[in-house]
Amino acid sequence: MFPWTKSFVENHNKFEPKTIFFGSEGANVVAVVDLLIKKLISQIDEKDYHNLALDQIASPNFYLLKADEGKSFITMDQLRAPKDFLTLNTSKNRVLYIQSAEQIRIDGYNALLKVSEEANENIYIIIATSNLNAVPATILSRFHKVKIAKPSPEEVMIYAKDKGINSEQGVMEFISYNPWILEDHNEKILDALHGFGKQISDKKISSKDRLELDTFVDYLIFKRKKKVNGTEARDNLQKILELNDIKKSLNSPNNLSIDIAKLRITSCL
């Protein structure tokens, strides 16, 4: 666990009945809120769930709502399903956790609004999102909002160096603004990142992994943004627009093939 994540989780002890936790992608919102949810439901049930995955928690007081595996969105049926859970009279608090607000369509929010208004007073409805703008005003006005701030680049740099991570200055700077790369399960991405400079100089992309390509695009955008005020500002802005479109296509349900993505990325080198 990152030190800044540990500090936030340990110091957040008061939960409002309806809360949206939000922050930028670099704030790692879902991972942080997952930990908060484990903390809350452990307190309610007087059991220790900290070492369990959320979908392994078998508690009558907890309901996890997220898109099914392989799906991009939470269905209307899924959103309506917690109605009995939310309206059942019980002496204990209950928790409905919507793991990613980005997985709810606009029409789905109407169903969520109705469900939330029918919920008992002892129900916690917790939503996590990396894009507060994706949440309709009708929901925002009814929920307490808590921002999860990104760690400062200096904090991330100190942590990375303490972990023995060292690379060229540009890569280290990129990592300092994208601390998620330092998570244990992203070792493959971290290893690939060290080779991004050579791929750029050779104008040849070796990666065949979609997440690596997505990170490579982020790295190119990061480098281009540092040059938008220079003599090649116009070209850099055009390349940033193209790279953002590639990133969007990589992450869309009907995403680009790896080979086409690599061709488009190469044109931006």
Language model features with spans:
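A short alpha->loop->secondary-structure connector
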Residues: A81, V115-E121, K145
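Loop/turn-to-beta-strand initiation segments
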Residues: S91-V95, N120-I126
